[in-house]
């Protein structure tokens, strides 16, 4: 009340000073002369301008805060707090003169005490603002809010001690006490402040948690969460983290020698628990440190002589012989050989003949034996030389013959490449000649006849050879045609004719661009035959889409397939434009091989080009055919490396901070947040043989049948839009039509085959040509998911062309599992018009490329408000974490916590999920449950809820 009376008295005083009591007559001066109607007026004084405005302040304990205001030109400055004028006595005023302008500068100061702030009732904070007067009017300053600063003593959540194995992730949670201003949080490791910029193994999340990416032995320490603001500093209880190492066995040592050198014994081997040794309380190695086994060592047997043989007849040299062998027993198992001589001789004439009488063990007593050995060795040497000479002669003959054939093949391959031919001595190429690109097709003879004189591009280097394999090169290439030129037309650069399709397996079309011969072959030499080269080529429009995107983002979609790529706003750097594409790989060879109970659950999808810099994750959506039941599946995402082999990216529910992506699994699709573009496929592995795949069964028949035979094709496909679309396109080329709407079938991991059979055939007019009662598709053909258009054909025959009605039942079931029955009734004379065309040409969404704001359901202004409101951690948990929980995206929150805007990434994922819905109801419901009513008002104002 006193403040108001003071202000009134000040205003009254100002009015009295400005009031002139002297009356005056308009247009008459004091002498009675008529005055002019107007005088030149002085320039009007400007409105007050604030040089200093009051700033927000906090009252610490009982110390009042000072608020300052400075303005010019100003005759008066007063403070107004919470709508009431502050007493003039509480103002401290200073005046000065601005030397530059000569105007008077007025500065006012007041103090606000804790008591004044506490006496305020209501939800609004205590505020003050300045009001400055001049002769031209008044000006108000900004509002300055004054709050009582505090910091509670108790933490909402304190870190807990943990024992973790080496190289595992560690999460220490901390929720600081409530305070004004909001407390800043830092972590201490053994009383040293943790700086993630210096040690990247540490990560501080946006909600103040500490994450150790891979625990090291050096990370064993005491960790403390510290919260501080201008009032106080609080420390949490210390959490001790122990990084332990479980012991591991070393390799087994070699087996020791057998304990007995002869007969039965024992031998053992040992290992030590040192690979690694247990540390910090880690578990000791499980198992035995040594192994013992029985051994049997075969005893050695020494050789012994047999009895001497009888003496031989007396020879011309007056001697006879006898022999013995070391065979009683022979030496075995390392036993000693017999000692002594093999042969023995003596004079057989009782001394009548003494010529050359020597014993055989005398080396000089066998001159004939020595000469015989020399002759034998000489003969062997001569034989070796003869064999070598014959082999060399044969080799020379074969080499010359191969050279002639090779030269002819080179000539033929050059002619095939250049379009020319030889008028004489033309030899048909061998079918197995690897130098020819197209051995089974005749050369292109549209070029002028004669021998080609220009350079020959025979593609003989290893980098130029195009292998004839089932690699991904053969399937996606769209009609690579090679133009060939004669020497007479090289100068003009025009080709004479188009060559045959490369490898003879490509669909019709032309190679992009108008290349000359040299440029084209240079491209073949420099380009890689891997996936990166193929991605630049034109593709089937039904399985490929591309677009140019900037920083505003957009969406690529393949209609009728469930495959899309969402590029969020800000994912592409400012000022850059990327040509992005999305492609479904149809070839079976582009799918990874299934091992064990693994199965391919989605199509192989390529988004590219790879290696682009992305500022935030993009969202790739692919359909899958898994019946999602918790605990039945082990899901994996795999990517194709540059060498063509597949590598695991992530196993769901086993993510760590180093995982480069996040998978949001829905009932029939999977949304993948990616930092890198590439080729991806979603796979699953049955856990304890309880997993179930969703299949769809489709029956096709010929649209027009003019013969007695009639066939039914029963397809067993993965329950994805991609699989059905491929079969519809295939049947359209075969002239078939869909007899009945596809039906679902649950296929269990039970090793049981899929059985198909026909029933209730009208035998009076039809008969089945199938000898057996049923057909079966092996379990692994269905389960692995890598075989496209899997089907069985039932061939029937009608007795006459007059039989145009056909009815039967088709039963498809898994042995000891579920099944489906089709009741068919068709008229052969009626051709269903356009049934497949309607299915193939009417996808759920015909738009393939959406750019900028048109691709998103949430307007950018609403998105920014939601992010600014939910990104900051809230002690009540009413932030992005609760939003993720409400939207069922909280499977691994640490992925979002590492992003600059967790809310933005969650909204990107929501955008990918809501591609077909097109409204904001689910998001609005989540925000309403969170109590974010101001966001609902913004959505109702700016959006189209």
Curated annotation (Swiss-Prot):
SUPFAM superfamilies: DEATH domain, Immunoglobulin, TSP-1 type 1 repeat. It comes from Mus musculus (Mouse). The lineage of its organism: Eukaryota, Metazoa, Chordata, Craniata, Vertebrata. This is Netrin receptor UNC5B. Residues 48-145 form the Ig-like domain. It is found in: Cell membrane; Membrane raft. Residues 707-725 are annotated as: Interaction with DCC. Receptor for netrin required for axon guidance. Mediates axon repulsion of neuronal growth cones in the developing nervous system upon ligand binding. Axon repulsion in growth cones may be caused by its association with DCC that may trigger signaling for repulsion. Functions as a netrin receptor that negatively regulates vascular branching during angiogenesis. Mediates retraction of tip cell filopodia on endothelial growth cones in response to netrin. It also acts as a dependence receptor required for apoptosis induction when not associated with netrin ligand. Disruption phenotype: Complete embryonic lethality, due to defects in blood vessel development that lead to heart failure. Mutant embryos display increased branching of the internal carotid artery and of blood vessels in the nervous system, including thinner and more highly branched brain capillaries. Endothelial tip cells present an increased number of filopodia. CDD domains: Death_UNC5B. Residues 1-26 form the signal peptide. Residues 543-686 form the ZU5 domain. Residues 27-377 are extracellular. GO terms for cellular component: cytosol; membrane raft; plasma membrane.
